[in-house]
């Protein structure tokens, strides 16, 4: 999927997968860059009759978030909160029913989050910050774009589905 691009410093994207005739799983990704840093957030919910509703109490889900630039010489120094509101981390953690880890490479970061149990919208949301750095100099790179992509596998009784990848691109 090709990322949606914004001329401004913020952008968002959604992906859906149908569960049945009236229900869909939605993943939403937002990215914004300013002041040398990019923020991102993701949120997952059901959409029933056009309205967002939380996932059911017995949900297990795994979300993958990829953060990168189209410039292969940009390193993403990422910290994130999983779920939203938890203390920011840069490696991985266990926050109650949410387990996460981060895998880094020279030009991208992958945040993998496992959710156990349903609940509020916030429980299936992740937010964070990336400092795009030039690999050669270690200095902030505000010339290149920032791409945030996410997909999620959601399982609960009778359902085991994975969304398409939602990608958004923004610039400083």
What are these regions (language model features)?
Residues 122-157:
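Internal, hydrophobic beta-strand segments that form the core of beta-sheet-rich folds
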Residues 156-172:
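Short beta-strand elements
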């Amino acid at each position: 999927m090709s990322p949606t691009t914004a001329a401004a410093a913020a952008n968002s994207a959604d992906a859906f997968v149908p569960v049945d005739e009236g229900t869909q799983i939605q993943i939403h990704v937002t990215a914004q860059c300013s002041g040398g840093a990019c923020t991102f957030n993701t949120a997952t919910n059901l959409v029933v009759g056009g309205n967002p509703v939380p996932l059911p109490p017995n949900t297990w889900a795994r979300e993958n978030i990829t953060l990168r630039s189209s410039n292969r010489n940009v390193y993403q120094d990422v910290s994130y909160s999983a779920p939203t509101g938890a203390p920011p981390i840069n490696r991985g953690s266990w926050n109650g029913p949410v387990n996460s880890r981060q895998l880094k490479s020279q030009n991208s970061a992958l945040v993998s989050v496992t959710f156990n149990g349903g609940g509020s919208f916030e429980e299936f949301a992740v937010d964070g910050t990336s400092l795009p750095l030039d690999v050669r100099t270690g200095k902030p790179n505000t010339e290149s774009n920032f791409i945030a992509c996410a997909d999620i596998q959601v399982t609960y009784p009778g359902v085991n589905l994975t969304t398409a990848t939602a990608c958004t691109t923004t610039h400083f």
